[in-house]
């Protein structure tokens, strides 16, 4: 009977541990999903002059610290051939709103001089990392360190929410919320490395905001 009792308690303990582990993993995955947002853009720089707008807010609702801190919107703009064209970081204070013009801020300074008409925008909600020319948000994740390896110091942090308008083919303007997706380590590393790759060889090109070296200016 003693052995049977021990076995029973052991089984209960194992089940409880499994439940806790599952809950912990689920929470971590939810946190990662809530830090990565994606959307498309279409018909940029159209002859009618109808622009699209990206709006990003920092509600402070799910912030891991109190009082809630400012967060970086790390922005990566791709064309429809999966090539990164521009990247930038924008510091947004709690309850703050950033409004970015697609034509003027996000596709006007491609690293290769070819502005995309259609593509997608990826936004990582992250803690400030203060390495991009002395401003708080570095979308390259610190670039390459003295050891010759990528620093990769972006820390995804929950809270930012984003919306975007879209110019449809009939030139009607629609708006929707950015969709959340799970941010894998591989994707996060790739975004930082690709961003560093284009801004390090672009001589000012490849940075969002009409060539302004300080990308936080986009949001002021």
Predicted regions located by residue number:
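Gly/Pro-rich, tryptophan- and cysteine-flecked surface segments typical
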Residues: 25-220
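Sec-dependent, cleavable N-terminal signal peptides
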Residues: 1-30
């Amino acid at each position: 009977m003693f052995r049977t009792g021990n076995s029973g308690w052991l089984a209960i303990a194992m089940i409880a541990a499994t439940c806790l582990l599952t809950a912990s993993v689920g929470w971590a995955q939810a946190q990662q999903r809530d830090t990565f947002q994606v959307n498309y853009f279409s018909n940029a720089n159209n002859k009618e002059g109808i622009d699209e707008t990206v709006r990003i807010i920092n509600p402070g609702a799910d912030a891991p610290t109190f009082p809630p801190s400012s967060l970086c919107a790390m922005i990566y703009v791709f064309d429809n051939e999966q090539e990164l064209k521009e990247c930038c970081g924008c510091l947004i204070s709690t309850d703050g709103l950033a409004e970015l013009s697609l034509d003027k801020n996000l596709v006007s300074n491609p690293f290769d001089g070819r502005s995309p008409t259609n593509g997608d925008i990826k936004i990582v909600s992250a803690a400030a990392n203060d390495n991009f020319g002395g401003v708080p948000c570095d979308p390259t994740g610190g670039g390459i360190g003295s050891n010759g390896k990528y620093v990769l110091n972006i820390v995804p942090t929950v809270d930012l929410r984003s919306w975007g308008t879209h110019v449809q083919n009939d030139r009607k303007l629609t708006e929707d919320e950015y969709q959340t997706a799970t941010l894998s380590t591989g994707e996060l590393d790739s975004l930082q490395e690709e961003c560093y790759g284009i801004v390090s060889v672009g001589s000012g090109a490849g940075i969002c905001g009409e060539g302004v070296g300080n990308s936080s200016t986009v949001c002021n």
